[in-house]
Amino acid sequence: AGVDLTIVAAQSRSDVQLNQVQDFIAAKMDAIIVLPQTTDATGPITSAVRGAGIPLVYVNRRPSALPDGVPYVGSDEKYAGELQGGFLAKALNNTGNVVILQGDPAQEATRLRTQGCQETVEKAGLKVIDSQAGSWAREKGLSITETWLQSGKKIDAICSNNDEMALGAIQALQNAGKLAQVKVVGVDATKDGQAAVKAGTLAATVFQDAKGQGSGGIDAAVQLANGGKVAAVLDIPFELVTADNLAQFAGR
């Protein structure tokens, strides 16, 4: 049997998302899949959907509070940071100064990617000398990196929570003629991110399998709607992308 999907976008607003979920409840959907706008604001969504007795599945961003019976389909965000940190430790022979470009501090992905990178590089003997929030935006990555460069501190690597901020950092380093001395890593393996890996400006990125998360979310929702059981967490693994294995990620 086929699945009828109704998809809406929340325009990055939690209040809009809650209203959309309430509309889905009123429409008596068989299951609801939510990619939360902010991971700290899922309480009202969870209460409303569970109160209506409708199966709920969260995808991509893990809610801060994940109650029993509500599965999460996504990737282990801390592991993304650990992959970045492991790559940098090896590339820098376990010595040097690292700065971290963080996404949105209200999101679990920001906290976990940052923690994964920081713990991994520090364990290897590198120093994290600063971290700043760049709201996932390229222009913020650029302006924060400019400020770091102006500070005169020695920076050997920039660990960015996503490719967009990493690309901004690369622009700032290119403008200052310092890209050759600094390794930049990102997360997402976006089209632009992959192009930068190919060009040799982005040392590495981390592939997040959005298609795998989406299909996993639908599979879980269908199973729950049919009275089946689903694991609490369905992990779709992150993968490190470098110049060596870039070809296998094209078009994924």
Regions found by a protein language model. Name each.
Residues 1-252:
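A residue-level marker of the well-folded mature domains of exported/periplasmic proteins
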